[in-house]
A protein has these predicted regions:
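N-terminal Rossmann-like NAD(P)+-binding subdomain of aldehyde/semialdehyde dehydrogenases
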Residues: 2-116
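Conserved small-residue-rich beta-alpha loop and adjacent elements
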Residues: 101-154
């Protein structure tokens, strides 16, 4: 890793904090309400807007793959750094490339002969369970899928 890249990774690590921890039922309720409001706004986004956000999130996740891998090992005490980095990279790049052209907003399929339309609508706020064995790659995967489908995830 070049000195420039190492500095960039170190700077990124400093911005990734645990400041969003929820430690009470009241905090959780407030967070859920905020997420619900944000998701309602996001549910109105166009396919073009969603795709732009999806790409930006995948790119950001891929850039953060090294510090996220380090943090996962520090927090769980499990894993091999290089393996975590590869999993994070795979989660970001593969999911983006697999779904970047998928229609996820509005009418996604139409059979004019039968008058049938398939419409993609978000579910709303969904819960994401994260295993200790692969915390960061799982969060990357689930977050990207939630963004692509205009859902919010907690």
């Amino acid at each position: 890793m070049t000195t420039k890249n190492k500095k960039a990774v170190e700077n990124l690590e400093k911005t990734l904090t645990k400041s969003n921890l929820v430690d009470s039922a009241e905090q959780l309720e407030l967070l859920v309400e905020r997420v619900k409001k944000a998701q309602k706004i996001y549910s109105k986004f166009t396919q073009e807007q969603v795709d732009k956000i999806f790409k930006a999130a995948a790119t950001a996740a891929d850039k953060a793959r090294i510090p996220l891998a380090r943090m996962a090992i520090e927090e769980t005490g499990m894993g091999v750094l290089e393996d975590k980095i590869i999993k994070n990279h795979f989660a970001a790049e593969y999911i983006y490339n697999k779904h970047k052209n998928a229609k996820t907003c509005g009418i996604i399929k139409e059979n004019k002969a039968d008058g049938i339309k398939i419409v993609a609508d978000p579910l709303g706020v969904i819960a994401g369970i994260v295993p200790t064995t692969n915390p960061t790659s799982t969060v990357i995967f689930k977050s990207l899928i939630a963004l692509k489908t205009r859902n919010a995830i907690i």
